[in-house]
Amino acid sequence: KLLRTEALAGTVASHTDDSQAQRLGEWLLNDDKNQRENMLVVEDICQRLQHSTQTLEVLPPQVVRLRKVQHLRRCIWTELKQANDEQCLLMLQPTAAVAGLPRQPAREFIQKVEPFNREWYAGSAGYLSPEQSEFCVALRSARVQEDSLRLYAGAGIVSGSDPEQEWQ
């Protein structure tokens, strides 16, 4: 019945030098645009879970340092009224990071404005088992078809975003 999820939104470059990486991480923790982006995802997750949970706790923001980038993360812990992993997954997908907010207008905008079909752009990767389940949002993928390779990637755009910077 316990659900542990996270809002992983808001990104800055990482660095091989620990002190440089730490400075960038501190900037990320204090940047209004990235905090807003992360909170949009937090609020969306909480709203989707509100009718299915007994308790809901959002932990303070942290920086997750990876090799090339650092992300802003807020863990969300909850106790579900009923344990149903498949329903939980369906309730949370597609995430705000994939579909945008408000969800339906964002999806309609994407279909109208983007000059291509997203096809395999994003989805869920993970496993279901009787004891526990674990899933993550897969935001990068590749499709090999005969002699061609198509790569899929994207960036989160919110008010205040610099689209060129998002691709860095």
Task: Specify the residue positions occupied by each region the protein language model found.
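Hydrophobic residues embedded in beta-strands of well-ordered beta-sheets
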Residues: 2-3, 149
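Contiguous alpha-helical scaffold segments within structured protein domains
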Residues: 4-111
